[in-house]
């Protein structure tokens, strides 16, 4: 009986650890508009960061302001798609996977 309880507890701990590891990463996308692709991507990346972590967004605004960078996160699978549209002429969607450092 003790062995069964230990196995159940160990399995539960492993499952919890796995879910915590997965919770460290998130895939997000944002949409932005601007007069150029660069400005629309900037707005879209802001939306990604604001939807992920406000403190990362604040650090980003105070530092690089480079699309694809996120203070405190490793960014991968960065993709963007832009087209004519939006209030200012160009509309972009930017998406990425962000994993907490």
Report each predicted region and the residues it spans.
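C-terminal edge-of-domain segments
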Residues: 74-101
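Short, well-ordered alpha-helical segments
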Residues: 27-67
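Bacterial N-terminal signal peptides
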Residues: 8-16
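Sec/Tat signal peptide C-region and signal peptidase I cleavage site
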Residues: 16-23
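Acidic-leaning, charged glycine-interspersed low-complexity segments
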Residues: 67-73
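Bacterial N-terminal signal peptides that target proteins for export
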Residues: 1-9
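C-terminal alpha-helical interaction appendages
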Residues: 23-28, 86
């Amino acid at each position: 009986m003790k062995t069964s309880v230990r196995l159940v507890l160990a399995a539960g701990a492993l499952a919890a650890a796995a879910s915590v590891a997965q919770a460290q990463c998130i895939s997000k996308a944002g949409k932005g508009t601007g007069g150029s692709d660069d400005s629309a991507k900037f707005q879209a990346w802001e939306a990604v960061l604001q939807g992920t972590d406000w403190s990362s967004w604040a650090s980003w605004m105070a530092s690089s302001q480079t699309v694809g960078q996120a203070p405190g996160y490793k960014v991968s699978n960065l993709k963007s798609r832009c087209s004519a549209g939006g209030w200012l002429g160009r509309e972009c969607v930017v998406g990425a996977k962000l994993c907490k450092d």
